[in-house]
């Protein structure tokens, strides 16, 4: 049993009920973020508090929701196009692991160019992402604080990672108010994933 270790964490963690209200302060003045989420969260009304807070702070934003569980390359390329079209300069990943991973990979393509397939594996991302803030609404993935994102190959069903310290979010907002309404089954499975 080793009693010594090093631990480095570059993500600023904001925690507590209602902490979503601190989102504008984590973004640069005048930022224009792309919010990456999924249709289920839009339907559940969980995107509304985020857009309202940004709007109240006078920030313009764009929303991208073409995200599926076990995301594929088209989810990333579509998001990168949305980021460019809306002239965004920051990214917010809102949801479970899939939206947060897609947000990371959109940032990779937006700053490094090409296709996400070019960055599968470790150490292939050369340029840092735009400011990325992740807001998890489930309990299990940990994507909001890690240097990993996972892309699924639909032909083989194999999941390939993008691994780089450059994709670690600058901040994570852990607001229990956003996860309290999770369906019991989803809360249970993602909670067990965390354990």
Placement of each model-derived feature along the sequence:
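ATP/NTP phosphate-donor binding region
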Residues: 1-90
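Glycine- (often His-adjacent) and acidic-residue-rich active-site loop
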Residues: 56, 68, 108-117
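FAD-binding core of FAD-dependent oxidoreductases
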Residues: 92-104, 138-141
